[in-house]
From Swiss-Prot:
Keyword Metal-binding: no
Biased composition (Gly residues): 183-244
Signal peptide: 1-18
One annotated GO molecular function: serine-type endopeptidase inhibitor activity
Positions of the BPTI/Kunitz inhibitor domain: 98-151
Example of a GO cellular component annotation carried by this entry: extracellular space
Cystine pairs: C98-C151, C112-C134, C126-C147
SUPFAM superfamilies: BPTI-like (SSF57362)
Entry protein name: BPTI/Kunitz domain-containing protein 2
UniProt keyword terms in alphabetical order: Disulfide bond, Protease inhibitor, Secreted, Serine protease inhibitor, Signal
C-alpha cells in the first residue's frame, strides 16, 4: 500500500509541474481547460529528469514531443504512467505541429520585414498565408506537399477498417447460394438484409440456380438464372425470402443449343482487293493393286529345293538349297523310299 501511495503522489506532482511548465512555454493557463496539445506536446526536461529518477531506467517508454527550438517532433524517454507526450511521430505531427494556430511571424529587423508565401494547415486543409520570415510556429511549411505529408486530413471511419453495415451486407453471400461460374447448379446468393440476389452461374449444361433472397427491409427477390451456352435458355430465378428463413432456390431449365450463323458468301473481286484466291483441289491418286502370287516362281523354288547339289543329279545324295523341315521330309520320302 505504501508503494502504490507513493507512486500516486509522485504522479500528481509530475502532472502539476508539467502543467506549470506548459503554461510558462506559451501553452496557456494551466488548469482543467487545457487541451491535448498544451498538455502533452511540449518537452519539459525538468519533468523528464525527475521521472527518470522516480521510475528507474527499466520503466521508461518512448514518447514524442514537439520542440520549438528545432521546429519538429523529437523522441524522449518518459515514465510509463505519465500522460505527457505522444505515442507516435505521426500523432505528434498531427496534434502538436499541425494544430497550432497559423502565425504570420514577428517583425523587427531587416530580415523580418520580407513577405513570403508559406503553406499552413487550417481547418483540415492546407492553405497559403503570408509569412514575415521570423518567428511563427511549427504550422509553417514551404510546399503544399510537405504540408499534406505532415498534416494529412483524417480519413473516414470505413477507410480505417470499420465498414458500414450496408456495405458489409451487400458483400455477404446467401446461405443457400453457392459460387459457380461453370453452369452447374449454384449461382451467387442474395445478401443478408434483404438485398436482391445476384444472377446465377454462367453458361454450361444446365442453367445456374438463382440465389434466394433473405428476409429484410428492402427487396426480397431471388437472383436470376444463369445464361445458356450459345444462346441457350437460362436457369430459373430463386424464390424471395419469407419471414426469417432464406428463400428456396429453383433449378433452371436445360440450356439449348442456339442456331448457328450461316456461312457468309465469298467476296467478289474488286479493283482494290483483286481476284479471290481459292485453294487448289487435291488430286485423287489410284490405290496400288495388291501383288499376286507367281506360280512359276513357286514351282521353281520347290525344284531347286528338291534338286541335289552334287553333279550326280537325281541319283546322289541331295542337299536342299535352303533348309525347310517340311519340304526336306517330303524330298527324303520321295527319293529314298
Amino acid at each position: 500500500m505504501l508503494v502504490f501511495g507513493f507512486a500516486f503522489l509522485s504522479l500528481l506532482l509530475i502532472e502539476t509541474e508539467a502543467q506549470q511548465q506548459n503554461g510558462m512555454m506559451g501553452g496557456g493557463a494551466a488548469g482543467p481547460g487545457i487541451n491535448k496539445m498544451e498538455r502533452g506536446c511540449y518537452d519539459t526536461p525538468p519533468i523528464q529528469r525527475r521521472a527518470r529518477r522516480q521510475c528507474g531506467g527499466g520503466m521508461l517508454v518512448p514518447r514524442f514531443f514537439y520542440s520549438n527550438r528545432l521546429n519538429r517532433c523529437i523522441m524522449r524517454r518518459a515514465c510509463f504512467f505519465m500522460r505527457t507526450g505522444m505515442r507516435s511521430m505521426i500523432e505528434c505531427n498531427k496534434e502538436c505541429r499541425c494544430m497550432q494556430p497559423p502565425s504570420e511571424g514577428t517583425g523587427g529587423g531587416a530580415l523580418c520585414e520580407r513577405e513570403v508565401m508559406r503553406w499552413m494547415f487550417v481547418g483540415e486543409m492546407c492553405v497559403q498565408r503570408m509569412f514575415s520570415g521570423c518567428g511563427g510556429n511549427g504550422n509553417n511549411f514551404k510546399t503544399q506537399g510537405e504540408c499534406m505529408k505532415f498534416c494529412k486530413p483524417r480519413e473516414p471511419e470505413f477507410m480505417m477498417g470499420e465498414m458500414p453495415s450496408e456495405m458489409a451486407a451487400a458483400m455477404a453471400f446467401n446461405n443457400r447460394g453457392r459460387n459457380n461460374f461453370g453452369g452447374s447448379p449454384g449461382g451467387w446468393g442474395g445478401s443478408p438484409g434483404g438485398w436482391e440476389g445476384s444472377p446465377g452461374g454462367w453458361g454450361g449444361s444446365p442453367g445456374g440456380w438463382g440465389g434466394g433472397g433473405n428476409q429484410g427491409r428492402r427487396v426480397n427477390r431471388g437472383g436470376g438464372g444463369g445464361g445458356g451456352a450459345r444462346g441457350g435458355g437460362g436457369g430459373g430465378g430463386g424464390n424471395g425470402g419469407a419471414g426469417r428463413m432464406n428463400g428456396n432456390n429453383q433449378q433452371g431449365g436445360n440450356n439449348q443449343m442456339g442456331p448457328t450463323a450461316a456461312t457468309p458468301p465469298s467476296p467478289r473481286p474488286t479493283m482494290t482487293t483483286g481476284p479471290v484466291t481459292r485453294p487448289i483441289p487435291s488430286v485423287r491418286r489410284p490405290k496400288p493393286k495388291p501383288k499376286r502370287w507367281n506360280n512359276n516362281n513357286n514351282n521353281r523354288n520347290n525344284n531347286l529345293m528338291i534338286q541335289g547339289t552334287t553333279s550326280g543329279g537325281w541319283g546322289g545324295t541331295t542337299t536342299p538349297s535352303y533348309y525347310n523341315p517340311y519340304q526336306s521330309y517330303i524330298a527324303h520320302e520321295y527319293l529314298f523310299k
